[in-house]
Amino acid sequence: YFVGANFWYGAILGSEGEGGNRERLHKELDFLKSIGINNLRVLVGADGENGIKTRVEPSLQVAPGVYNDTILAGLDYFMNELRERDMTAVLYLNNSWEWSGGYSVYLQWSGHGDAVVPAVDGWPAYMEYVKQFPQSDSAKALFANHVNYIVSRTNRYNQIKYVDDPTIMSWQIGNEPRAFSDENKEPFARWMADVAAQIKSLDPNHMVSSSSEGSWGCEMDMS
């Protein structure tokens, strides 16, 4: 059986750069293991430039296809530490919410104007902005490139390909993915299916989950 917990900052703690603290990582993993937690849900990494007060940093993907190698190393290190403790991970790749970039950063990168920051501009403005994502082919294409890059990588500490690593319990498409409008429900469902198929084409060995909030994730339409 699995007993899980959220541990979004695992890749950052595993880094030897800004934000990294491997001693703390070891202590936290040892403690979690000691109380029976054996599965951690982890953010692969944040998207977008650093310096946005409401966003996790340091960022992993600082520009489209441009990666902070210290965070990639942190992710690899974190995964290897889980492996040594016989623990597993659920790795999520995107985010509906601004705290790690996600939808809003992909929209900004693909020419939809500056990303809206809810702490500054308000939540209604944010949700109006990010509802463009499910119908933006250019934003979705940038995310597809990110999926290819992450899923296809090899861990530098143990030379195990991610697709072959039993430490991964599941990939998740994103954190709490939402359509953000009724008219987006069908495009959103198609996008989710496309991403799941993309991941499975790269990695037939692991589960793919949505991380949906259920009714909130489908505009209260569970049909």
For the regions a protein language model found, what residue spans apply to each?
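Active-site mouth of glycoside hydrolases
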Residues: 1-223
